Regions:
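N-terminal secretory/membrane targeting signals
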Residues: 1-11, 17, 21-54
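Membrane-interfacial helix-loop connectors
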Residues: 106-108, 169, 180-194, 198-199, ...
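Juxtamembrane and boundary regions of transmembrane helices in multi-pass small-molecule transporters
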Residues: 213-214, 223, 232-281, 449-506
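Hydrophobic mid-bilayer segments of alpha-helices in multi-pass membrane transport proteins
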Residues: 66-74, 91-108, 128-137, 282-292, ...
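Transmembrane helical segments that form the transport core of multi-pass membrane transport proteins
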Residues: 290-420
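Transmembrane alpha-helix boundary signature
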Residues: 50-54, 85-86, 105-124, 128, ...
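Juxtamembrane interface elements at the cytosolic ends of transmembrane helices
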Residues: 72-84, 141, 176, 180, ...
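Interfacial loop-to-helix junctions that mark the boundaries of transmembrane helices
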Residues: 55-66, 87-94, 117-129, 232-241, ...
Length: 506
């Protein structure tokens, strides 16, 4: 799911990946926490070190009602804009705060203030801070790249943009690729009557599927990289699955876009850019800054400083602090050195990133007990799921790993989910890259591919939604999007399951 950052491959959230998670404890799954920032700050002022009674949140003692605030928030996101759009857009921050409070208050009352503050400090300082810094930096830098010229939203042009974005997503990350290309794509299709499907397929391909080939592509794979999976392992083991998935989805897009394009041509189109206008890219310095962002994130993972700062039980490692400072500096540099007219030409505003920040904060506050319950494994409330993962001989069912990892990644943060199933499969990188390579492949596919099933499955999904909505595209509701994703992606995933997991090719 959404998001989420786990150290982040330019696409999502940052999850605790530098230490193994003991069964029954919660490292605080995901990146999110705007609302928890204040509590975390209070925790820092309160002492800076964790008191003896601040035990880790034990998922095995949490009953199922702890899931309700998370489900309530998801339902609010799903139906709020649909049933009461004006009220939702005016008060969604308050609604997010309400559900977050319904998670945090019982947590403090039943498990102790110290435990709650330690958990929130970890979430805010160890997860959300890096998450929002990376997303904001990419949003700012990509917003300074202005593509001008006769870029018309024909099926050929649209397919080319989607294919290009899919190809570069594993290099600059799904968030990076999405933020670079979404505005030119919207501008190219602004005169078309039917353009919603273009954005929906853009989310499928560029914001998710394209990131499956490197740790820089999507947060779950970066988590695997930090746990010992070699940098090029995903490229060598997932290229066929990614190629087939992307090809099938792109073929579906071309068919749909041709059909809608023919409908649009029956109506006079106004406001098109003249065909003889050359394509010009302005703000080229921001392309260099994108490369610099990738380098900073990669180097932060490779550099082991051995220096850390303990803040109320959350260790901030020096390389992570340096990375975040460098990313903020890059964002500032983009704002300073990019002419204002470039962002004005892109229709750049701060509202989309603010909306993402608030919603993701609430999601990951509410997800705290859910993730703890998942980490409890066989002793936890979700123990009934685990027998589905192995056959009668104890061998892993790769198809089950794919679908369960993917289903949870569609509604939870995909990076923590990757880590949960990574540990469930043994947690040993050498074994998973060797004899259990098909299982690791299934986990990676599920975490990356199925993040496209919902708006909250991966961080860039909702950013794209927010940008498109602000630009006047009538994006489908939460459930409306799931109808699109279910109709297009589920059959594709079924084919991929049969070809690679049930009847694997040699």
């Amino acid at each position: 799911m959404i998001s989420r950052l786990d150290v982040l491959p330019l696409s999502g959230a940052r999850t605790e990946v530098r230490q193994k998670v003991p069964a029954g404890s919660c490292p605080m799954s995901a990146p999110s926490k705007i609302g928890c920032g204040a509590l975390a700050a209070g925790a820092v002022l309160a002492g800076g070190t964790v008191p003896a009674n601040a035990a880790a949140l034990q998922g095995l003692v949490l009953p199922w009602p702890w899931v309700l605030p998370f489900l309530g928030l998801l339902l609010s996101i799903a139906v709020g804009p649909l049933l009461a759009p004006k009220f939702w857009h005016a008060h969604y921050g308050k609604i997010v705060f309400m559900w977050s409070a319904l998670t945090v208050t019982p947590l403090a009352a039943l498990h102790g203030i110290a435990t709650a503050l330690a958990a929130l400090a970890h979430a805010a300082l160890g997860e959300y801070l890096s998450f929002i810094i990376v997303l904001t930096t990419l949003y700012v830098v990509a917003g300074g790249i202005l593509v001008m010229g006769s870029l018309r939203g024909t099926p050929l042009v649209n397919a080319a943009i989607l294919a290009f974005g899919t190809a570069i997503a594993s290099i600059v990350g799904t968030t990076g690729a999405a933020m670079i290309l979404i505005r030119p794509l919207l501008r190219a299709n602004s005169a078309r009557l039917h353009n919603v499907h273009v954005v929906v397929f853009f989310i499928f391909l560029v914001a998710n599927i394209g990131g499956a080939l490197s740790p820089l592509g999507d947060p779950p794979l970066f988590v695997g990289f930090l746990h010992g999976i070699s940098f090029f392992w995903n490229a060598t083991h997932l290229w066929r699955q990614t190629a087939l998935t992307a090809a099938l989805v792109l073929a579906a897009f071309i068919a749909v876009d041709i059909w809608y394009y023919r409908q649009d041509r029956r109506v006079a189109v106004v406001g098109e850019t003249p065909r003889n206008e050359p394509i010009v890219v302005r703000g080229m310095i921001n392309l260099l800054l994108i490369v610099l962002i990738v380098g900073v994130i990669l180097l932060s993972a490779l550099w082991k400083s051995g220096v850390g700062f303990d803040i109320y039980g959350t260790t901030l490692e020096l390389q992570d602090v340096v990375r975040d400072i460098a990313l903020v500096a890059i964002a500032v540099a983009s704002l300073v050195f990019t002419p204002d007219e470039h962002r004005e030409g892109n229709g750049f505003t701060w509202e989309p990133i603010l909306e993402v920040a608030k919603l993701f904060a609430g999601i990951f506050i509410c997800i705290i007990p859910v993730t703890a319950m998942l980490h409890a494994g066989h002793a936890g409330p979700f123990s009934w799921v685990l027998p589905l993962m192995t056959d009668e001989t104890g061998a892993p069912r790769d198809a089950a790993y794919f679908w369960l990892t993917g289903t949870l990644s569609a509604v939870l943060d995909n990076a923590p989910n990757y880590l949960v199933f990574f540990e469930l499969a043994g947690g040993d990188a050498a074994t998973l890259m060797g004899e259990l390579a098909p299982t690791l492949t299934a986990i990676a596919m599920g975490a990356v591919f199925m993040g496209a099933l919902t708006y909250i499955g991966n961080a860039p999904n909702f950013m794209i939604y927010a940008i498109a909505t602000e630009r006047g595209v009538k994006m489908p509701s939460f459930f409306g999007y799931m109808i699109w994703s279910g109709a297009v992606l589920l059959p594709v995933f079924a084919i991929v399951t049969y070809v690679f997991l049930i009847r694997p090719l040699p």
